Regions:
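Phosphate/dinucleotide-binding and metal-coordinating scaffold of catalytic cores
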Residues: 1-263
């Protein structure tokens, strides 16, 4: 078992990360991400909170998948979500610090990422292009991420949907996970419409770096100072996107006219 001190640090970092992502969604308002009213996509049925959902994974060699899991390498798999099968999706282990902690603890029940269109362009689950499965490592309540997302939604932050799922692999039970709508194309289209703007997921290269951009701080006009944001853009960057982002952070830093960049 990991020391309680490190467990506390990991939990704190998870909550901080959730609110940094919330801050990123706010800053993205200046890039054209304004919430819109739109018909609900069919895949939202998988995120209903009236029951624990079911997700079955079929992969040719599960042991081989676990062996390369630390490399976060995609393998081909078939998945069935509440009886709806999608064949030939991309499956990999997910996580950064959380994945390494799983390995250090000697476990193999990794968080998972399912990219429906990884091998076949346009493939989806009822319109959903990417799904994360949170193993809730070191969270026996399974509630920290779920509650953080619920708080974000309550505060009016555009928030990924989430639900609890029982996962099985090749017919064998693999445990309870939290399924989370990945903030990519389907997420952006659901909340911001077909003409959505840019979406970022700030992430540092090294924890020892200053990482001021991850904290959404304005550090000058040089786009290179915002590598941890621009590098993680979920869509292809267009001309002017970097300048728009920097302008939003400049305004947030000044504390004036914040309503111009925060929806």
């Amino acid at each position: 078992m990991l020391a309680r001190r490190w467990s506390t640090v990991v939990c704190a970092l998870a909550l901080v990360a959730a609110f940094l992502v919330a801050g990123a969604f706010y800053a993205a308002g200046a890039a054209g991400l304004i919430a819109v009213e739109k018909d609900e996509p069919a895949y939202l049925s998988f995120f209903s909170d009236d029951r624990v959902h079911e997700l079955e994974i079929s992969v040719e060699d599960w042991d081989a998948f676990l062996a390369v899991a630390p490399e976060e390498r995609y393998v081909r798999a078939d998945v069935t979500l509440d009886g709806h099968t999608v064949r030939g999706v991309g499956l990999r282990a997910k996580g950064n610090n959380s994945r390494r902690l799983v390995e250090q603890a000697g476990h193999v029940r990794y968080g998972l990422k399912i990219e429906f269109d990884h091998y076949e362009e346009g493939l989806s689950y009822l319109g959903l292009d990417k799904l994360s499965l949170d193993a809730s490592f070191q969270d026996n309540s399974y509630l920290k991420t779920y509650v953080a997302l619920d708080m974000m939604a309550f505060m009016g932050v555009p928030t990924p949907e989430a639900s609890f799922v029982q996962v099985s692999v090749n017919g064998q039970a693999w445990g309870l996970y939290l399924a989370v709508e990945d903030p990519e194309d389907a997420f952006a289209e659901r909340l911001f419409g077909d003409g959505h703007g840019m979406l970022y997921k700030p992430d540092y290269r090294r924890l020892s770096d200053e990482n001021a951009d991850v904290a959404l701080r304005y550090v000058g006009e040089d786009p290179a100072r915002y590598d941890n944001i621009l590098r993680t853009a979920r869509f292809d960057l267009a001309a002017g996107d970097a300048e728009e982002l920097i302008g939003a952070l400049r305004t947030l830093s000044s504390g004036e006219n914040i309503d111009e960049v925060v929806d």
